[in-house]
Structures are given as structure tokens and as C-alpha cells.
Swiss-Prot record:
PTM remark: Autophosphorylated on serine and threonine residues. Phosphorylation at Thr-157 increases kinase activity.
GO CC entries: ciliary basal body; ciliary base; ciliary tip; cilium; cytoplasm; nucleus
Tissue specificity remark: Expressed in embryonic heart from day 11. Highly expressed in the uterus and at lower levels in brain, heart, lung, kidney, skeletal muscle, ovary and liver in adult tissues.
EC assignment: 2.7.11.1
Lineage of producing organism: Eukaryota, Metazoa, Chordata, Craniata, Vertebrata
The protein's name in its UniProt record: Serine/threonine-protein kinase ICK
Domain Protein kinase: 4-284
Length: 629
């Protein structure tokens, strides 16, 4: 022992005390276990179970016995030093462990335990104090003082292991037990690592059985006949309890963890899995490729492909029927979804190669390889021609066709083909907008603001706008229906600047004018500005653009406004004059209300200005046009 120096005492047990020491030669920290009783011969020392078992067990998850020293009739075991035990690690936690850390801890415990059982020993005293740690990353099984060989004959001592981790057969004083008692202790430790609390903290052996019954429920005689024999031998009467759901007791455990825990804590020791079987539970099966079974994960991908067969493909329709081709191309996704998915190795490659498989089949070539080359990226020209001819008919399904083209990994040269497939209607709309923006005809611009349609074509650009408006009505869009609803429910307040647009219904939400441009009506907003400029050029009075405020003076109170709000003679439709009176001459679209007066006061709207007497012989518009809901 002169080669080691002792630093401090780490713990004290039934059979010995543990000291922290350091090797003088290497400076390595060690744990020195000093046995309490004296040993007077080496033969007596070598017969110790701890020495016999640890000499045979060399595993990464079993604490390593470095040396055995007998000096002055005292026996010393030199172990590798571990920072703490699992009980200290649990006690110092102020929050729960993540499940990944718990899985790592339990995996190491079961690995070491499987090695112990494989070599013919079982521990008999597994508890958190006997699991040494270097943080949650490394766990090793220690303290083999109660270890027995499995092949040794019963009877065994009935008082083994700490009471909270004792298996039911040991609590019922069985003398014929074996390695399943270690598996039960692992289940108790697993629950404690999840909850940071012991699962069965009984004050006595009978109290521990009662606590086990409260969690697992009273076992039936058919489930564990040996247990009823042991209980009758002790004159023990089973408490009648119903089982609790382990998920409610351990809410932070996954379903795989609950499945493993339920099997580790079986009443009947024959029904508990062995340590090596527990390692094969789904709880520990992580990281294998998705879509491949664990049996096939070790095989090369070529074997998996041969087993599952070639990837599925869709045969295109005959070239004589171009529309049928387009439908077949679009509906290839639902057809494939109904087929059984046999493999999912690199699914994005399989998705990208569907159009290539179509071209391979059409040209009479064999099936493409499992990892297809990306040089043949163009769709067949006949299918493109069919789609180009029927682009108007396929308009409602444009989203699907767009998704299919985007999956085919097109190159930069192939994006020109997209204009033939789906953008004909949108390009026409953009053309019409540009023509409207460049048009100098104020009538067309005023009509674009109010969405009016004259009875006869006027000017050169009217036929184009009529065609575009009919196109818009044929295709139901959210934009046109929203604007029609908006204009049908509009009201007119005298003196409101037209720059603010038509006043919305007071009961509806207010739609700001800026949102029109964001919804694709930028051409219409420019028309509004031109009309406002002509209106302001006629009247010299200034109008407020902020709507109705507390200090607002209506424009009809001003003397300079003149005949803006008076009835005017309608001008002929064929030759509109640039003045404002010609703009007033446009008849509104039949069935659609024109400017109306404000209805009676509505809650939530700013109050109207006080009523005044008619000025300059103006007509009382509120009496002439009653309010209309």
C-alpha cells in the first residue's frame, strides 16, 4: 500500500469502507475498498465472491478491479475511480433528465448486466448507489459483494438487495430465485431515473408489496401461481388493487419506454425479459434508415432493390389523344399513391425520375437504373404539344401541372416551355393591364375604377377590355367577386374626395385603397388618379382627403364648387369630352347601384356634418334618393 496515498473517505458500507487514493507512480486517481474483517490467508481472500466474479468480468460497463492487496491481515481492493454514483447524480438534479440521456444510462446498465449474466453471475444488489458514473455519459456496475453464480445451488439468502429494488419473489421470502431479480431492479431504477423519485419506497417488506400492488395491481392466481404459494406460506393476504397506468405515473416517458418498463416489472419472474432481450426492445432501436426493416438495414441497397422489384412507373396514353395524355400525366400521383409502397430508399430520387421513366418507356428503352441520370430532363415533345393546345381547357388543374413540372428538375433551358403550359391566361391579363395603363381615354379609366360596362364599344381599346372582362367573368376569381361585393354595398357621401375610392358599407370592414394594388389592380388605381386630377381641375375649391373628421367642411358648402353636384345634361356616348360633365354622363351598369347618399346613422361610423339649407338651388339628395340597404 506504500505505492498509494489516501486522500479522503468516500463512503462506508456493510462489509467495508471506500477511500479516495492516488497512485504515486502515475498520479492516477483510484478507489480503495478496505474490507472490515481480517483475512489470514490468500486462499481465504481468493474465495471471496467479489474477487472471483471481478477476476472474470472485464467489460466497459463494469467497474475494473485493478489490484488485490493483503497487508497486515487487511484486504484492500484497488478499483478505477468514478466521480459519483447514480443516486448522487439523481439527487443533485433540479430538473428531469432528457429521454435521450435516460436511454443512454439504461442501455449501459443493461449491457453490463447482460455481460454479467452471460458469464454465469447475477448481482443481487442492483441499486443507484451501486451504479458508478462519470456524469450521465458513462455508467458502470460496481459492488459485487453479494454476487452469486447462477449455477450455484439454492437455497440463497432471502435478505438480499435494498428493499425498494427488491423483486416480489424475494420480498415473499423465496429461496429459489435467479437473474430475473436483477431485471426487476433495473425496472425500478429506470422509473426512478425518469421521475427522480423511487417507484416503490416501502417502509418495510410488506409495505413494499403493498406499494407494488398499488402500481401494478393485484396479481391473479393464474398469472403467478408461485407467488400465491409463497404468500400462503407467509400467511400473507393480498390487497385488492387495480393497476395504475404507468404513463400517468411517468408522464415524461415515451410509449416505447412504458412498454419496456411494463415488461421489466412483471410479477412472474419467468415473464420478465432477460437483459439481452431487453436490449432488443424498440426503445433502443434508433438511428436505422427509415422505410427499411432492421433485418434489411445491413444488406446493400442492390439486394433491397432486387427484393422489392423495380420502381413503379405510369405508362402514357397513345399519342393520338393529346388531352388524354395531359390527364394521364397529371393523375400519375394519385395512381401511384394507391399502389403499395414497397421501398423508400432515397425517395426524392424516385420522385424526380418519374418523367424520365415516361420518356424511357415511350422510346422503347428498358427501365432506368435505381439512381437515374439527370441528363434526360425534357418532357416528350408530343406531350408538350398536347398541353400547349389544351392550355385553356386545363386551366382549373394548373396547380397540379405546375407541381409536376417543378418535380422534374428542369434545367435553365427548359423554363421557356412553361409559358406554353399554364401562363397564357395570366399573360393575357398582364397585356390588358398594360394597354389600360397606356390608354389616354378617360372614359375607359373611369370605367375601370367602377367596373362599368358600356352598352356599345367605345374607342379602340374597348373591345380588348370587354374581352378581358369576359375572360375574368368566365374564370371565377376571388379578386372580381370581392370587388363586385364591395361596389354593390358602397354608399356615397356628398363632398367625399374620390381619391379615397368608394366608401365601404359601414357595417363591413374598411378596405384601404392600398390593398387594391396588392391584389393585382394597379392599373385601376392609376385610372383613379387621372379622374381625380380632372375633377380637381374643374373645381377650384380644395377638398380634404382624410374623409369625415370633426372639423370637416363638406365641399357643397363652398361657393366655388359650382355645378359639380347639380343635374347635368347627358352627353352622347360616342364622343366623350375631356371635361368632368362627360364623365358624369356615363350611365351606370344596369343592376348595379351608382353613388348613393349615406343611410341613417350607423354605430361605429363618424357622425355626419350638421344638416344645412340648400345652397344655390341645390337638390336635397337625401329626399330625392332614399337610403337603400
Amino acid at each position: 500500500m506504500n505505492r498509494y496515498t489516501t486522500i479522503k473517505q468516500l463512503g462506508d458500507g456493510t462489509y467495508g469502507s471506500v477511500l479516495l487514493g492516488r497512485s504515486i507512480e502515475s498520479g492516477e486517481l483510484i478507489a480503495i475498498k478496505k474490507m472490515k474483517r481480517k483475512f489470514y490467508s490468500w486462499e481465504e481472500c481468493m474465495n471471496l465472491r467479489e474477487v472471483k466474479s471481478l477476476k472474470k468480468l472485464n467489460h466497459a460497463n463494469i467497474v475494473k478491479l485493478k489490484e488485490v492487496i493483503r497487508e497486515n491481515d487487511h484486504l484492500y481492493f484497488i478499483f478505477e475511480y468514478m466521480k459519483e454514483n447514480l443516486y448522487q447524480l439523481i439527487k443533485e438534479r433540479n430538473k428531469l433528465f432528457p429521454e435521450s440521456a435516460i436511454r443512454n444510462i439504461m442501455y449501459q446498465i443493461l449491457q453490463g448486466l447482460a455481460f454479467i449474466h452471460k458469464h454465469g453471475f447475477f448481482h443481487r444488489d442492483l441499486k443507484p448507489e451501486n451504479l458508478l458514473c462519470m456524469g450521465p455519459e458513462l455508467v458502470k456496475i460496481a459492488d459485487f459483494g453479494l454476487a452469486r453464480e447462477i449455477r450455484s445451488r439454492p437455497p440463497y439468502t432471502d435478505y438480499v438487495s435494498t428493499r425498494w429494488y427488491r423483486a416480489p419473489e424475494v420480498l415473499l421470502r423465496s429461496t429459489n430465485y435467479s437473474s430475473p431479480i436483477d431485471v426487476w431492479a433495473v425496472g425500478c431504477i429506470m422509473a426512478e431515473v425518469y421521475t427522480l423519485r423511487p417507484l416503490f419506497p416501502g417502509a418495510s417488506e410488506i409495505d413494499t408489496i403493498f406499494k407494488i400492488c398499488q402500481v401494478l395491481g393485484t396479481p391473479k392466481k393464474t398469472d403467478w401461481p408461485e407467488g400465491y404459494q409463497l404468500s400462503s406460506a407467509m400467511n400473507f393476504i393480498w390487497p385488492q388493487c387495480i393497476p395504475n397506468n404507468l404513463k400517468t405515473l411517468i408522464p415524461n416517458a415515451s410509449s416505447e419506454a412504458i412498454q419496456l418498463l411494463r415488461d421489466l416489472l412483471q410479477w412472474d419472474p419467468k415473464k420478465r425479459p432477460t437483459a439481452s432481450q431487453a436490449l432488443r426492445y424498440p426503445y433502443f432501436q434508433i438511428g436505422h434508415p427509415l422505410g427499411i426493416s432492421t433485418q434489411d438495414s445491413g444488406k446493400p441497397q442492390k439486394d433491397v432493390q432486387d427484393k422489392t422489384g423495380p420502381p413503379p412507373y405510369v405508362k402514357p396514353a397513345p399519342p393520338a389523344q393529346a388531352p388524354t395524355k395531359a390527364h394521364t400525366l397529371i393523375s400519375s400521383r394519385p395512381n401511384q399513391a394507391s399502389q403499395p409502397h414497397q421501398h423508400f430508399v432515397y425517395p426524392y430520387k424516385g420522385e424526380a425520375s418519374r418523367t424520365e421513366q415516361l420518356s424511357h418507356v415511350q422510346e422503347g428503352q428498358p427501365n432506368p437504373p435505381f439512381f437515374p441520370s439527370l441528363h434526360n430532363k425534357n418532357l416528350p415533345p408530343k406531350i408538350l404539344a398536347g398541353l400547349e393546345q389544351k392550355s385553356g381547357d386545363m386551366k382549373p388543374k394548373s396547380r397540379r401541372r405546375w407541381g409536376l413540372i417543378s418535380r422534374s428538375t428542369k434545367g435553365s433551358d427548359d423554363w421557356a416551355d412553361l409559358a406554353d403550359l399554364d401562363f397564357s391566361s395570366s399573360l393575357t391579363r398582364i397585356d390588358v393591364k398594360n394597354k389600360k395603363r397606356q390608354s389616354d381615354d378617360p372614359l375607359c379609366r373611369f370605367e375601370s375604377v367602377l367596373d362599368l360596362k358600356p352598352s356599345e364599344p367605345v374607342g379602340t381599346g374597348t373591345s380588348v377590355s370587354t374581352q378581358a372582362s369576359s375572360q375574368r367573368r368566365d374564370t371565377p376569381t376571388l379578386q372580381s367577386t370581392a370587388k363586385q361585393h364591395y361596389l354593390k354595398h358602397s354608399r356615397y357621401l356628398p363632398g367625399i374626395n374620390i381619391r379615397n375610392g368608394v366608401l365601404p358599407n359601414p357595417g363591413k370592414d374598411f378596405l384601404p385603397s392600398s390593398s387594391w394594388s396588392s391584389s393585382g389592380l394597379s392599373g385601376k388605381s392609376s385610372g383613379t388618379v387621372s379622374v381625380v386630377s380632372k375633377i380637381t381641375s374643374v373645381g377650384s375649391g380644395s377638398t380634404s382627403s382624410t374623409g369625415l373628421t370633426g372639423s370637416y367642411i363638406p365641399s357643397f358648402l363652398k361657393k366655388e364648387v359650382g355645378s359639380v353636384m347639380q343635374r347635368v345634361q347627358l352627353a352622347p356616348l360616342a364622343a366623350p369630352s375631356p371635361g368632368y360633365s362627360s364623365l358624369k354622363a356615363v350611365r351606370p351598369h344596369p343592376g348595379r347601384p351608382f353613388f348613393h347618399t349615406q343611410p341613417r346613422s350607423t354605430p361605429g361610423l363618424i357622425p355626419r356634418p350638421p344638416a344645412v339649407q340648400p345652397v344655390h338651388g341645390r337638390i336635397d339628395w337625401s329626399s330625392k334618393y332614399p337610403s337603400r340597404r
